[in-house]
């Protein structure tokens, strides 16, 4: 199995390639039966890729087979992924080999460049521990990583508002026991500082609070909410 074939198989297993695109590619491949095994190979070759349940089972079976040969979690992580902090320990398994290379700094406390010590994969990471308690990871190329090391960062996580919007595509904000917690106050302040015209309703949605609470958070910072 070539590295390109392995990469394509993993892309399907983790959901980063369309079903029909993968089916057409797979049927054009030779010499995959031996590394995949007769049963799995036949399942992938003969499946109805229009059936979502079938596709889900295929992805799960393929991931289990491929994971047995991996020394890290990188190949199984989607190109854009959310890794919960704590919980079932996925974050510990992922970050057992992913090491910090560069912090953005300059007030962007959440943004980092990291690299896997096993496979060499680079990741741009937004560590969001105020609202979602998630790590958001973007798989990036070696060229993009070199650009970051030259202080040219991609825009995807470059503002806190963008990070929170990405968070909403994966989960709902954590419910804070303290409606006026420091993390909420600081987050509202960060959002307003970067985009002064942001509305109370927008801040409320991003932080997972009511508009009334969002207004109080801004007032706690000495900010006057827009009318």
Locations of regions flagged by a protein language model:
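Short, Lys/Arg-enriched anionic-surface-contact patches
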Residues: 164-187
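Short functional micro-motifs and their immediate structural scaffolds
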Residues: 79, 121-124
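Short Cys/His-rich metal-coordination motifs, predominantly Zn2+-binding knuckles/fingers
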Residues: 75-77, 116-119
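Acidic, Ser/Pro/Thr-rich low-complexity regulatory regions
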Residues: 1-110, 129, 133-141, 145-146, ...
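Short Fe-S-cluster ligation motifs
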Residues: 144-159
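Short alpha-helical "recognition helix" segments of helix-turn-helix
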Residues: 202-206
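Short, amphipathic alpha-helical "recognition" segments used to contact nucleic acids or chromatin
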Residues: 180-199, 218
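Major-groove recognition helix of helix-turn-helix-like DNA-binding domains
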Residues: 211-224
């Amino acid at each position: 199995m070539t590295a390109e074939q392995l990469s394509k198989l993993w892309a399907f297993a983790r959901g980063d390639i369309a079903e029909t695109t993968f089916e057409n590619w797979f049927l054009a491949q030779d010499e995959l039966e031996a590394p995949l095994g007769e049963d799995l190979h036949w399942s992938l070759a003969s499946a109805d890729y229009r059936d979502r349940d079938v596709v889900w089972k295929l992805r799960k079976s393929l991931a289990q087979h491929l994971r047995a040969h991996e020394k890290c979690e990188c190949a199984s992580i989607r190109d854009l992924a959310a890794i919960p902090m704590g919980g079932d320990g996925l974050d510990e398994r992922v970050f057992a080999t992913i090491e910090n290379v560069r912090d953005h700094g300059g007030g962007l406390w959440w943004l980092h460049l990291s690299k896997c010590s096993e496979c060499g994969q680079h990741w741009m990471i937004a560590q969001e521990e105020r609202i979602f308690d998630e790590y958001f990871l973007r798989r990036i190329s070696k060229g993009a990583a070199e650009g970051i090391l030259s202080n040219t960062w991609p825009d995807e996580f470059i503002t806190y508002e963008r990070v929170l919007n990405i968070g909403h595509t994966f989960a709902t904000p954590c419910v804070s026991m303290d409606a006026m917690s420091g993390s909420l106050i600081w987050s509202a302040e960060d959002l307003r500082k970067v985009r002064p015209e942001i509305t109370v309703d927008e801040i409320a949605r991003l932080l997972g609070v009511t508009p009334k609470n969002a207004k109080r958070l801004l007032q706690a910072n000495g900010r006057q909410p827009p009318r």
